[in-house]
């Protein structure tokens, strides 16, 4: 199961996504670990079963066990943080920001891989989940660690394409296209 297989599942109306998926996974300013950790974290965050089934094995071919665990951890913890911090932002009451969050995130303290990579994966998941406060925080941390804007942009590009592919494939599976996707298996 590969990027190529997932690209084959995309219908003609999603040709741009097909091309974008190929380009973001082959031409990047990200290291291989950063790229495939971003792919894995974004696939998890996108909640698309088929997308995760198709992309995870290829991602695991490029990631150490520690990196795969760190990408999964980033996806899991950002699922929590993105809801929490996006909600605080939307409430528009700064008093909530002064309250202790009380949410455990110990796994991010020692992720077993370079913290820049985990920040990129957290940024990508935050992009998928639409948390502006988290995006700003992760971008600020990455820029403070000397990460170029082009690298940050590539992580966001990967996340946006993976998410769009997940939405498109899920729509196919839900609509009359279900048989078409299932038949491709």
From Swiss-Prot:
EC numbers: 1.11.1.28
Keyword annotations of the record: Antioxidant, Disulfide bond, Oxidoreductase, Peroxidase, Redox-active center
Gene3D superfamilies recorded: AhpD-like (1.20.1290.10)
Disulfide bonds: 131-134
GO MF annotations in UniProt: alkyl hydroperoxide reductase activity; disulfide oxidoreductase activity; hydroperoxide reductase activity; peroxiredoxin activity
Domain of life: Bacteria
Known function: Antioxidant protein with alkyl hydroperoxidase activity. Required for the reduction of the AhpC active site cysteine residues and for the regeneration of the AhpC enzyme activity.
Complexes and interactors: Homotrimer.
Protein name: Alkyl hydroperoxide reductase AhpD
Lineage, highest ranks first: Bacteria, Bacillati, Actinomycetota, Actinomycetes, Frankiales
């Amino acid at each position: 199961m590969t990027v190529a297989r997932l690209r084959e599942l995309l219908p003609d109306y999603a040709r741009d996504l097909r091309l974008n998926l190929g380009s973001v996974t082959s031409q990047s300013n990200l290291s291989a670990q950063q790229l495939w950790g971003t792919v894995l974290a974004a696939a998890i965050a996108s909640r698309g079963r088929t997308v995760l089934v198709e992309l995870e094995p290829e991602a695991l071919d490029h990631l150490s066990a520690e990196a795969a665990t760190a990408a999964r951890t980033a996806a899991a913890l950002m699922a929590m943080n993105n809801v929490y911090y996006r909600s605080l932002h939307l409430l528009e009451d700064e008093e909530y920001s002064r309250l202790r969050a009380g949410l455990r995130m110990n796994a991010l303290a020692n992720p077993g891989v370079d913290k820049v990579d985990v920040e990129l994966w957290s940024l990508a998941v935050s992009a998928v989940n639409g948390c502006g406060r988290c995006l700003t925080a992760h971008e600020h941390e990455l820029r403070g660690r000397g990460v170029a804007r082009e690298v940050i942009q590539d992580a966001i590009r990967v996340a946006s394409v993976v998410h769009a592919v997940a939405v498109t494939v899920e729509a196919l599976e839900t609509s009359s296209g279900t048989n078409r996707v299932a038949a491709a298996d």
